């Protein structure tokens, strides 16, 4: 069944003309990217994660919703920063504490020469309830675009994250750190608006997942990502995700 779902998703990627430029402001599909919002630019996101089936124990996972707002706060060309917050729901009793905050600082790709990668460090999911929602996921990431004879191979990103050891667990044991990996590419051969990505976050905590997706950019400031999330903990149901992003 899972293989049929993946085949359907990949056929959708190839069949439908969808798009975006590199990533959303804070994430690729799932994990943080090296992108940072420009100074005074606001970024509104509305994300949905819909389970494809029951968890392995037979329980039905809730649909997760996330409404977030981020803004760029540094007026420099070679050093950017953004701050933001998210309102999340679908986590049962944790919905009593729905607010989470994030901060990121980054240096754009090629800022100090053509071989210089994009760099970013940050923290996200800073919750307001101690030992319940204070996941406090710290990360660092580097990304670089490669090409051969003016043909882009896409951007490759690699990084590392670490979160709260009491909350990022698997089977009762801490599993709170791991790799961040991503490949993404704007498919200019088809359209400058067509963007695809494969995104990975390590661990078998609830943060660990492999994600595949594409995006369509409806206008200069509005885009929608369509993706599929394979959780590293195979006891958890996979999810479809739809994410709308608006810059203003």
Which residues fall in each region the model found?
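Alpha-helical interaction elements
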Residues: 153-157
């Amino acid at each position: 069944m899972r293989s049929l779902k993946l085949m359907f998703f990949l056929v959708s990627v190839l069949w439908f003309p969808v798009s975006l430029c590199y990533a959303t402001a804070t994430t690729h599909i799932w994990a943080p990217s090296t992108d940072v919002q420009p100074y005074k630019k606001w970024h509104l996101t509305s994300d949905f994660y819909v389970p494809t089936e029951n968890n392995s124990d037979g329980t039905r996972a809730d649909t997760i919703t996330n409404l977030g707002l981020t803004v760029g706060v540094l007026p420099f060309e070679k050093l950017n920063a953004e701050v933001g917050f998210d309102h999340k729901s679908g986590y049962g009793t944790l919905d009593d504490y729905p607010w989470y905050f994030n901060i990121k600082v980054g240096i754009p790709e090629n800022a100090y020469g053509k071989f210089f990668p994009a760099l970013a460090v940050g923290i996200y999911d800073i919750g307001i309830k101690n030992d319940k929602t204070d996941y406090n996921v710290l990360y660092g990431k580097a990304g670089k675009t490669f090409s051969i004879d003016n043909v882009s191979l896409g951007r490759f990103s690699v990084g590392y994250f670490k979160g709260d050891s009491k909350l990022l667990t698997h089977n009762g044991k801490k599993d709170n750190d791991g790799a961040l990996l991503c490949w993404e590419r704007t498919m200019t051969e088809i359209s400058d608006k067509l963007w695809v990505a494969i995104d990975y976050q390590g661990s078998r905590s609830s943060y660990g997942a492999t994600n595949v997706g594409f995006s369509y950019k409806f206008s200069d400031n509005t885009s929608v990502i369509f993706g599929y999330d394979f959780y590293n903990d195979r006891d958890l149901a996979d999810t479809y995700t739809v994410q709308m992003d608006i810059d203003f």
